[in-house]
Amino acid sequence: MVKEIVNSLPEASVVVIPQDSYYKDSSHVPVEERQFINFDHPDAFDWDLLVEQITMLREGKAIEQPTYSYITCTRQPEVVHIEPKEIIIIEGIMALVSPQLRDLMDLKVYVDADADDRLIRLIRRDVIERGRTPETVISRYERIVKEMHWEFIEPTKKFADIIIPQGGHNTKAIKTLQMSIGYFLKR
């Protein structure tokens, strides 16, 4: 959905900041113990750095965005240089969890996806991109991901200015969001 929105906007006007880039570094944790870290809990994120860098972008300053490896569960030495743009999209299922981050947002969007769609997306992503087995992904979903969704993600719906039902399949809502952002750019 984010790609569809970004592709409809002038390239020079938008930057996407993936929340996943701001996972805390786990390199100090022994490799065999990293599998027990709950990456679906808000404590897994470096909120201070994310808020600091979004603030910098809003002030017209460039940032050095961290990179994160899902394979090793560690922050990488490489960074991504990001120039400030008129539109900053913070992409992530926990983007509305932090009050400090919410305060930096002009428009807060919650994408409401069906539980089955969330599970299917998780399986596809973790098996294809992260080299995990379907069994491992399903087990993690049942033990951790589902509970974390209901405890931390679902409650943030109340902070959203716009709630998009049907996840990324809601073409009318996506078009409406594209028009809203386009209107903002013309102001």
Q: Regions from the language model: what does each represent?
A:
Residues 1-12:
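A conserved segment at the C-terminal end of the G1
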Residues 4, 83-84, 124, 128, ...:
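NTP-dependent small-molecule kinase module
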Residues 60-68, 113-118, 135:
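Conserved Switch II/interswitch segment of TRAFAC-class P-loop GTPases
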Residues 76-130, 185:
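ATP-dependent NMP and nucleoside kinases share a basic, alpha-helical "lid"
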Residues 11-16, 108-110, 161-163:
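Conserved beta-strand scaffold positions in the cores of enzyme catalytic domains, especially
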Residues 44-47, 51, 116, 134, ...:
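Amphipathic alpha-helical transducer elements in NTP-driven molecular machines
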Residues 67-76, 88-93, 143-147:
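Short gly/ser/thr-rich secondary-structure transition/capping motifs
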Residues 12-18, 24-72, 87:
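Conserved nucleotide-sensing/catalytic segment adjacent to the nucleotide-binding pocket
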